[in-house]
Amino acid sequence: MAAKEVIFGDAARAKMVEGVNVLANAVKVTLGPKGRNVVLERSFGAPTVTKDGVSVAKEIELKDKLQNMGAQLVKEVASRTSDNAGDGTTTATVLAQAIVREGMKYVAAGMNPMDLKRGIDKAVAATVEQLALIAKPCTTTKEIAQVGAISANSDYSIGERIAEAMEKVGKEGVITVEDGKSLNDELDIVEGMQFDRGYLSPYFINNPEKQTAILENPFILLCDKKISNIRDLLPVLEQVAKAGRPLLIIAEDIEGEALATLVVNNIRGILKTCAVKAPGFGDRRKAMLEDIAILSGGQVVAEEVGLTLEKITLEELGQAKRIEIGKENTTLIDGNGQAINIEARVKQIRAQIEEATSDYDREKLQERVAKLAGGVAVIKVGAATEVEMKEKKARVEDALHATRAAVEEGIVPGGGVALLRARANINVKGDNSDQEAGIRIVLRAMEEPLRMIVQNAGEEASVVVAKVLEGKGNFGYNAANGIYGDMVEMGVLDPAKVTRSALQNAASIAALLLTTDCMVAEVAEEKPAGGDMGGMGGMGGMGGMM
């Protein structure tokens, strides 16, 4: 086991604070509408340019192990805030640095770190209560656009795209971000339910221009087994042919003579059909087939429920107004399912989301809810170069998280004003003078986001903070244009969840740093420089070769 270095007291804390400052100073240059970019080196390809706090934080590793511990703890603040609220990572880092900086003065003066921590916790709890009172619901498309724009570093076109997407697919809908093919941002709305499986044979195509198969008013046969024998399918094919309507078959797989017969019937115009593999794998495939069945008003042909292909009637088949099948996607529009059944299914999936342990499972379940309840919107990000594309895409994703957070917990005035207004209404007392000091640490740190925004805009922070404190309510300073006024009216809004998460996470990690009194790190081994190779002995004469 490698030797360890153990450092105590002020020396340990001083090293940690150095690490905190290196990371926080790199992150905080990005704060506010006039924040600067940070360029991140890549081992191959072009460097990445970003204004996203957590992206900068994740890149930083310091050579000094003790400093690095401090930096990694603040990195945790940014990461946790990003996970909880999707934005506010820079604000959280700035708050953490301010709490650590103020707190270290009191620790050095001999105050009890544990009492300081209790005071910090009391102040944070009181502030969170006040933020909830200040917050107002975010309901209008305009407010959603403003929140998105502020989060995307004052890019109003991004805010408008996100608001438009939310309006189209609803608050439950899935909004995904993809690389675009042009210079402009585009928004694609997929109505109805879409899943990522296409036609099994190009012979099903009936729209050569779009290379898709379009079925109007079709029946839908859902089966959780492979279909290879045409005899199994004949009874249902005859019933559908009599009804004179097209048929979409979704099964685990369709192969051999079954697929060949369907293709031949389709080409000859006897029965308009299309065959598609069921989406997903394993248990998720069964669940998604069930979703499609509920949406289309049909039943899944499965042995567990006593249904076989030979026994099935038209009543068990699903129906839809229109289905479009492409090479890779199938879209089911206006299914025949009953609203009450769809709502019950959505409720059931939501209960599963509550119990889901992994992020991947949760994401997949949310996708299923969206496909049943809302729809799917795709924002295609346009840019001139790949570097710009990556930077812009990261901002769009941030803005998307921020708007979701705003819809969830409401909005507060932005630009660091919400924390100052919450601070003005806090009436909390500590049990002793050390706890009182802990409360003062947090109250002082709450000015820091506004100070940093103003500093990055090239103005005098103390003057602006004093003027904002003179005002009331939503009165604040808009750093984008240097105007004082009502932040909500000017469209400078923050999601309450983002501000709350930033403060809670910053205080949590900062309090841990303040209560640290010992650090243990591996001793860096000094590797001796490699000496030159000794002269190699001469090779003996080689015997004569035969």
From Swiss-Prot:
Q: Does Magnesium count among this protein's keywords?
A: no
Note the superkingdom of the native organism.
Answer: Bacteria
Locate the residues binding ATP: 30-33, 51, 87-91, 415, 478-480, 494
Q: Which organism is it from?
A: Herminiimonas arsenicoxydans
Q: Which GO terms describe its biological process?
A: protein refolding
Question: What family is it from?
Answer: Belongs to the chaperonin (HSP60) family.
How does the annotation summarize its subunit structure?
Forms a cylinder of 14 subunits composed of two heptameric rings stacked back-to-back. Interacts with the co-chaperonin GroES.
Q: Which GO terms describe its cellular component?
A: cytoplasm
Protein's UniProt name? Chaperonin GroEL
- The membrane spanning regions, by residue number, are none
> Which class of enzymes does this protein belong to?
isomerase
